[in-house]
Amino acid sequence: DVKDKVDEERIESLRRTLHDFANEFYSWGFVKYDVKRIAIQLNKAKVELTREKLTEILSREFNYKPKNSGITQSVFNSTIDKIMRTLEITDEYYTKKLTQKIFSEEFKQQINNTLEKETGYVQLTIKKYVSKVYFDNDIVSKVFKSIDIFNKAIYLDDPFVLDRGPVNGVFSKVFERNAYYGHQDNLCELIYGNQEDYNLVDKIVADERLEKIMNKMQFACKGKVFFKDNREMLYKQDNVLIPFKVANLSTGLKTFAILQTLLLNGAIKDGSLIILDEPEIHLHPEWQLLFAELIVMLQKEFNFHILLNTHSPYFLQAIEVFAEKYGIDDKCEYYLSYNEHEESFVKRVTGNLEEIYAKLAKPLQVLENLRYADE
């Protein structure tokens, strides 16, 4: 929700200003428990809030009396000025800055096309709603009609994210003021940040749809992921006395462990958007078939929106076959990416997958030609 994010940004700015002011002459207890409340109050009243009203609120909340205070009138007035400037900044400006932070972190400040200096844009179309973000020199120049999306996107591209754990991952960042981080830190937060929910749901597993998925997953992931002392993530199989630390699992098993954890702790919900970047890379061919079937089952049971990228004709065919088996082939769209004249294009090839298979088969044909070249 863009409005909520903008409000969070403004409230955080107000909180920092109030924190600095309060810290001049109040205890840390006040700063910790009351400043955030005042910031929220000011943000709610921003439209009708005048300088006089703001002065009245701060004087009352901080019990500020110029003659009896150790803080000068100039410092108080400076705080009032800063708060008024913060409240006068438009939602559009905050939206722009928020978008900039997210894109800069995800793409490491390299957003625009490196081959040309033209204005670039990213467009998102959801049914009849269209949103565009324009970029010049890697800086957001305009946000056109931002869309509120209430389901968080989950991007899985690296099973080794499990090795980072909560200490080296997101928990080291949650205390940073106004921190924005990339998709792998976000994934760490979803894995390690919902431990209480995981333990609760794991005990009841009342959803028949989830049981279907877990039963199918047992063919590869024969154990269960759990947290020791709400901190360390371990993996336990029934026939093994001592549980494994997740860092010691095979790369393929880590892929299934991540999926199992996200399902059981409620991070993935009905209608979630899941982005899978070449999930077959670390999987044995037999497990590739299983993972493809799980993806199709998840879409059917939970109505997930799944964006899948693969370079494997084997894995692609598995998706195609299982989609037909489970009756969701009419929901699948297929696209082929290709380069032409130093530009990248994406072409819709639904109903004509031969184009994809032909392209993916070219390297094998090269080997075949080399093998029989001297015959």
Language model features with spans:
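Phosphate-coordinating catalytic segments in nucleotide- and nucleic-acid-processing enzymes
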Residues: 1-264, 269-271, 344-375
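C-terminal lobe/lid and adjacent interdomain/linker elements of RecA-like ASCE P-loop ATPase modules
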Residues: 4, 10, 289-375
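Short alpha-helix boundary/capping motifs
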Residues: 207, 288-289
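Short N-terminal micro-motifs specific to bacterial/archaeal maturation
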Residues: 240, 247, 282, 306-307
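Walker B motif beta-strand of ABC-family P-loop ATPases
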Residues: 273-275
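Walker B catalytic acidic pair
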Residues: 277-279
